A protein has these predicted regions:
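Secondary-structure capping and boundary motifs in well-ordered enzyme cores
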Residues: 13, 29, 50-58, 96-100
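Short, conserved catalytic/metal-binding motifs centered on acidic residues
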Residues: 19, 62, 76, 100-104
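Charged, often Cys/His-bearing segments associated with DNA-binding zinc-finger transcription factors
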Residues: 1-39
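Generic alpha-helical secondary-structure signal
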Residues: 36, 79, 106-107
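Short, Lys/Arg-enriched N-terminal segment that forms or immediately precedes the first helix
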Residues: 38-51
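DNA-recognition alpha helix
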Residues: 75-87
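Active-site- or DNA-interface-adjacent structural scaffold in DNA-acting proteins
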Residues: 89-129
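Alpha-helical support elements that line or immediately flank enzyme active sites
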Residues: 58-70
Length: 129
């Protein structure tokens, strides 16, 4: 059956079933974590130009999803396009642009190069306790 409110109805159903990503979003302060990441591993200079990076908070959410669901960069890109709860968690539900596999890799590599990738996940664990 066709419904103008299908997305809202699905979201309500996800919430009533206890979407674990909604709980994660409620208990982890991703904005504060993103600010810490920007302090630990600042973005490189954009003097050469190029497309502006996606927000650190969004990319952090994607790394957490990848870790939780054991997804490759390629699968993360696919799941972002396919799964409503991933889109909602990543705050991409109404976005026409989704980070691709290379963008996800570059962000993770930024953390690896700064040797802070494990700190990110340790902070998520700390906030969940």
């Amino acid at each position: 059956m066709l419904s103008l409110f299908a997305d809202q109805e699905r979201e309500a159903k996800l919430d009533s079933l206890g979407d674990p990503l909604a709980l994660l979003d409620k208990h982890v302060d991703f904005a504060a974590l993103a600010a810490e990441i920007d302090r630990w591993a600042p973005w490189p200079s954009r003097a050469k130009g190029g497309r502006p990076p996606y927000p650190t908070e969004l990319m952090t959410r994607l790394l957490v999803l990848q870790q939780l669901f054991n997804l490759s960069d390629e699968q993360m890109e696919f799941q972002l396009l396919d799964r409503m709860n991933f889109q909602r968690f990543a705050e991409l539900k109404h976005s026409g642009r989704v980070p691709d596999r290379n963008t996800i890799w570059v962000f993770r590599e930024r953390l690896v190069q700064a040797n802070v990738e494990h700190q990110v996940f340790a902070e998520v664990q700390r906030q969940l306790q």
